[in-house]
Amino acid sequence: MKIRIMENADLSAVINMMRGFYASDAVLTNGSEEIFRADAVECVSDSPYLEGYVFENESGVQGYAMCAKSFSTEFGKRCIWIEDLFVKEEYRGQGIGSDFLAFISGKYSDCVLRLEAEAENERAIHVYKKAGFEVLPYTELIKL
């Protein structure tokens, strides 16, 4: 499995995976075609805010991830939010998510890493905890 930066040629495959991810129980909102495209295009631009990654093998794309950059005043250092982490159903359980978490932990070893998970997504939470993430007791709020 190879992890690489998302490219323009990946947009169609990534947007298709986003449709599946956002239609699943892993997220609260369903997103929209407009949002999926904006997110994917932001990943392949020179954006200082969002990075996109693709996981692939000789058969093709296995999944994707998107990471947003910010600063954590709580911890006094840069913060990487793992916004999306999606592995196609047929490739789950092969360590791809764990490999990505190890990759991003190494790349941003001087940063706080954060992510969100639905409480019901026990399989993902197990992977995150195994990678060293801890559950925070916060209630998250949003204003759109």
Model-assigned labels for residue ranges:
Residues 42-54:
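A short helix-loop-beta-strand connector motif used in the catalytic cores of GNAT acetyltransferases and
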Residues 5, 105, 109, 129-138:
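Conserved acetyl-CoA-binding loop of GNAT-fold acetyltransferases
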Residues 54, 60-69:
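Conserved beta-strand in the GNAT
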Residues 2-16:
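A short beta-loop-alpha structural element at the N-terminal edge
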Residues 91-103:
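Conserved acetyl-CoA pyrophosphate-binding loop and the N-cap/start of the following alpha-helix
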Residues 83-92:
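A short, internal acetyl-CoA/4′-phosphopantetheine-binding micro-motif in the GNAT/acyltransferase core
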Residues 19-42:
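Conserved GNAT-fold acetyl-CoA-binding loop/helix
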Residues 98-99, 114, 119-137:
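Conserved active-site alpha-helix within GNAT-family acetyltransferase domains
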